[in-house]
Amino acid sequence: MGDEEKRNRAITARRQHLKSVMLQIAATELEKEEGRREAEKQNYLAEHCPPLSLPGSMAEVQELCKQLHAKIDAAEEEKYDMEIKVQKSSKELEDMNQKLFDLRGKFKRPPLRRVRMSADAMLKALLGSKHKVCMDLRANLKQVKKEDTEKERDLRDVGDWRKNIEEKSGMEGRKKMFESES
């Protein structure tokens, strides 16, 4: 067992040594990468941003500040004018859209409810209260009388089946049955 423990310790020591070497290599690579990025940043700034040239006297610096303030004021005025134009045009667009909807009649209509109305009430609503129109649709129909057929008469004669059963139940009912047969 002692031999195996020594081997395990040697393996773990070797692993730790390899990890530390790998971390050192990675750290140097990161430093090189940061240095390269900083150099790229300096090159980009040198190409795209001209160096600042400061005039020597205080009067020249004040003059430069006045010029810059004048440019800022001009830019602000243009910005304000553009905002006003945009607001006007958007308001005109809204008004034109509203007129377009008015002309088309595309208002949101409320849902209609179903109302039961007789023909007389409908005509009264359409024509007004001055005109009196009676639309009794049943008046024009033919009247048909129902003729009794033989089957219907027989059914009426039989009557309610409960009555027949009650009459035939008991001794008197059976007596009547025998008397009627003979």
From Swiss-Prot:
GO biological process assignments: cardiac muscle contraction; skeletal muscle contraction
Keyword Acetylation assigned: yes
Positions bearing N-acetylglycine: G2
Residues found modified as Phosphothreonine: T12
Modified residues (Phosphoserine): S118
Organism for this UniProt entry: Oryctolagus cuniculus
Region (Involved in binding TNC and actin): 97-117
Assembly with partners or alone: Binds to actin and tropomyosin.
GO MF, any single term: actin binding
Similarity annotation: Belongs to the troponin I family.
GO CC field: troponin complex
Protein name as annotated: Troponin I, fast skeletal muscle
